[in-house]
Amino acid sequence: MAEKKSQKNTPVKQIDPEQKEKALAAALAQIEKQFGKGSIMKLGDTQALDIEAVSTGSLGLDSALGIGGLPMGRIVEIYGPESSGKTTLTLSVVAQAQKNGKTCAFIDAEHALDPIYARKLGVDTDGLLISQPDNGEQALEICDALVRSGAVDVIIVDSVAALTPKAEIEGDMGDSHMGLQARLMSQALRKLTANIKATNCLVIFINQIRMKIGVMFGNPETTTGGNALKFYASVRLDIRRSGVVKDGDEVIGSETKVKIVKNKVAPPFREVQFDIMYGEGIARMNELLILAESHGFINKAGAWFSYEGEKIGQGKNNAIKWLKEHPEVASKIEQDIRNLLISNPTFTATPDSENADNADDEFSEEEL
């Protein structure tokens, strides 16, 4: 028998730490030269941590989101039942963004935007870009073009359920188009995500709820458009109407509850409640009074409310009226509350985990 050749253990080459640092610096320099500045950086760098936010118009929701609003350069999904306040909340975001000089666009796939109502919510309709596309492909192409331009800061897509594929529109009633919309959304979001981050554009998708058939245990509710949006969204808001606001026997608004079911930029699972008044939108002063009282900025003794020792009104309605008549004081109180509740505006973003999403494997929606 031939003798077995003795195997020599080749020693692992040890790299000098100084040479390692030089090699890493050279590699980073080459990457930045080839792909541009900021293409790679350390997570602890200030640039990577600073997340610009757009206010939602609700002080409570802004604080619950952790960074003072919805994050720029990210995808956000807002979903809920019919007449729960989804469009009202997004129009409120548009109004706040426009106040800060941002350019906004509204892709109205449902063809149902009411400009009169939008103006009542504070939206500058003259400066708002609007598109009413014929099909889902056209809507998402328009969205992609606006994002790539770098000139639009906030884009609303209303809604995912109305993004009907061209093949379905041109087909006959009753034709089966299994998974067509899910594939459309998956392809579009793959293209959009990198461009959205590069141009620091906020894209909000409004979505509807459907019921799963045959679910015996667990939540039978699901959103339309497959699983892709659940994965790509940095923030997902579940908005519901929890009650009504009455003036005597007349219903003048609705009590609204929002649950943050996913948040990649701050801790998730927080809930907040506020009122949406018909023809007015989010009741900002009502919310401000409640938060100011609960955090000690406004004191209440009996039925009287007081601020810095001065009585501002007897009863809630009179106190709200006083705040509306003194916007500079209301603004100061709001800023004090923001400084207290949003103590770290540059909160470290969490990894790309799916938080609350018990979604199926990403490939499942691709195969539909």
Curated annotation (Swiss-Prot):
Protein name from the UniProt record: Protein RecA
Point to the regions of Polar residues compositional bias.
Answer: 344-353
Molecular function via GO: ATP binding; ATP hydrolysis activity; ATP-dependent DNA damage sensor activity; damaged DNA binding; single-stranded DNA binding
Q: Where is the signal peptide?
A: none
Write out the entry's keywords from A to Z.
ATP-binding, Cytoplasm, DNA damage, DNA recombination, DNA repair, DNA-binding, Nucleotide-binding, SOS response
Q: Which domain of life is it from?
A: Bacteria
CDD domains attached to this UniProt entry: RecA (cd00983)
